[in-house]
């Protein structure tokens, strides 16, 4: 009897899938978008303000042989989030994966935090992500993937003057556990990644808030200090987070649900 040749299974492939990544114009979001495309997905590249960065990501994705479009929307505004999803499902005929990456950083001692700063941080990092998840549930194909963005500072890695940001991300950890229950009827999994310090194009701008006297250090000195926080003695980069996101987006992650995956090299 002749054997029937079957092609080998290639893990983490996303061929035929459509992904939406919020805050995908630069940094971790851009790396997510490109890596999802590298795995075969078509990608909606969301951005709030800078179309030039988003269009550069679209061009890079197209150079890989996949397809992408950029759509502007500020996810701190629920009406714009609703519009984003309505437009996104029209582009490639549906959505299979939603990655909520848009966020803002904040530093301030308890005595200095204003109502305006509180609202700014929570409107994007917490409220914004919640309503991205709501619209994802409404629009995702079944089975689907929702991947939210937390932080290692939301749990066991505390930083002075970082309470607003940390708490805004801590809420995401609770969302993930609860929303996984709500989304089960559509076979949609809900997880989050929790990066540590990650070297992006904005890394050195924010280092002064994380490290004492960073304004007096060279870039090399800052990188060495950050590398030593991890037992692996290296810095984290956007691609490190993007690879984990691609796993969570794939069929291989089907039995991972309601979890927050730390991606910080063991720093926390």
Swiss-Prot record:
Instruction: State the Gene3D superfamilies in the record.
Output: NAD(P)-binding Rossmann-like Domain
- UniProt pathway: Secondary metabolite biosynthesis
Give the EC number(s) listed in the UniProt record. Answer: 1.1.1.-
What keywords would UniProt list here? Answer: NADP, Oxidoreductase
Residues forming the catalytic site: 150-151, 165, 169
Q: Name one GO molecular function term.
A: oxidoreductase activity
State where NADP(+) binds: 28, 74, 101, 134, 165, 169, 200
| GO process terms (BP) | secondary metabolite biosynthetic process
> A Pfam family this protein belongs to?
adh_short_C2
> What CDD domains does the record point to?
THN_reductase-like_SDR_c (cd05362)
Task performed by this protein: Short chain dehydrogenase; part of the gene cluster that mediates the biosynthesis of agnestins, dihydroxy-xanthone metabolites. The pathway begins with the assembly and cyclization of atrochrysone thioester by the non-reducing polyketide synthase Agnpks1. The atrochrysone carboxyl ACP thioesterase AgnL7 then breaks the thioester bond and releases the atrochrysone carboxylic acid as the first enzyme-free intermediate.
Family, per entry:
Belongs to the short-chain dehydrogenases/reductases (SDR) family.
User: Which protein is depicted?
Assistant: Short chain dehydrogenase AgnL6
Identify the species of origin: Paecilomyces divaricatus (Penicillium divaricatum)
Its gene is AgnL6
């Amino acid at each position: 009897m002749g054997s029937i040749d079957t092609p080998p299974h290639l893990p983490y492939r996303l061929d035929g899938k459509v992904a939406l990544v919020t805050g995908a114009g630069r940094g971790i979001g851009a790396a997510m978008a490109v890596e999802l495309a590298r795995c075969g997905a078509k990608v909606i590249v969301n951005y709030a303000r800078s179309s030039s960065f988003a269009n550069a990501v679209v061009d890079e994705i197209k150079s890989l042989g996949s397809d992408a479009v950029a759509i502007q929307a500020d996810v701190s505004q629920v009406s714009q989030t609703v519009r984003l999803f309505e437009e996104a499902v029209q582009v490639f005929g549906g959505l299979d994966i939603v990655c909520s990456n848009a966020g803002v950083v904040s530093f301030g001692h308890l005595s200095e935090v204003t109502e305006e700063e509180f609202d700014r941080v929570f409107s994007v990092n917490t409220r914004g992500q919640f309503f991205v998840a709501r619209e994802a549930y409404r629009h995702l194909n079944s089975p689907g993937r929702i991947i939210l963005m937390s932080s290692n500072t939301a749990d066991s890695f505390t930083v002075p003057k970082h309470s607003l940001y940390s708490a805004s991300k801590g809420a995401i950890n609770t969302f993930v556990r609860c929303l996984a229950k709500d989304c089960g009827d559509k076979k949609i999994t809900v997880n989050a990644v929790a990066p540590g310090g990650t070297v992006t194009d904005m890394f050195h701008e924010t280092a002064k808030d994380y490290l004492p006297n960073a304004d007096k250090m060279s870039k090399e000195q800052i990188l060495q200090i950050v590398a030593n926080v991890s037992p692996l003695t290296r810095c984290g980069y956007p691609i490190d987070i993007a690879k984990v996101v691609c796993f969570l987006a794939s069929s291989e992650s089907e039995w991972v649900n309601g979890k927050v995956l730390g991606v910080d090299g063991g720093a926390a």
